[in-house]
Amino acid sequence: MAGTGRIPLWLVATVGGMAAITVLGIFIYGSYSGVGSSL
């Protein structure tokens, strides 16, 4: 954890957060639409 990585921590957190929100949104939308079982 020297902080000399090529990828900034904020960038990892941003991409990870967006991916998590996207997956969660798709899961909720699929369950709400009734097509969650097809996933």
From Swiss-Prot:
The chain crosses the membrane at residues 9-29. It is a single-pass membrane protein. It is found in: Plastid, Chloroplast thylakoid membrane. InterPro entries: PSII_PsbJ (IPR002682), PSII_PsbJ_sf (IPR037267). Keywords: Chloroplast, Membrane, Photosynthesis, Photosystem II, Plastid, Reaction center, Thylakoid, Transmembrane, Transmembrane helix. Disulfide bonds: none annotated. One of its GO terms (cellular component) is chloroplast thylakoid membrane. It holds the Pfam family PsbJ. Signal peptide: none annotated. PSII is composed of 1 copy each of membrane proteins PsbA, PsbB, PsbC, PsbD, PsbE, PsbF, PsbH, PsbI, PsbJ, PsbK, PsbL, PsbM, PsbT, PsbX, PsbY, PsbZ, Psb30/Ycf12, at least 3 peripheral proteins of the oxygen-evolving complex and a large number of cofactors. It forms dimeric complexes. Belongs to the PsbJ family. One of the components of the core complex of photosystem II (PSII). PSII is a light-driven water:plastoquinone oxidoreductase that uses light energy to abstract electrons from H(2)O, generating O(2) and a proton gradient subsequently used for ATP formation. It consists of a core antenna complex that captures photons, and an electron transfer chain that converts photonic excitation into a charge separation. This is Photosystem II reaction center protein J.
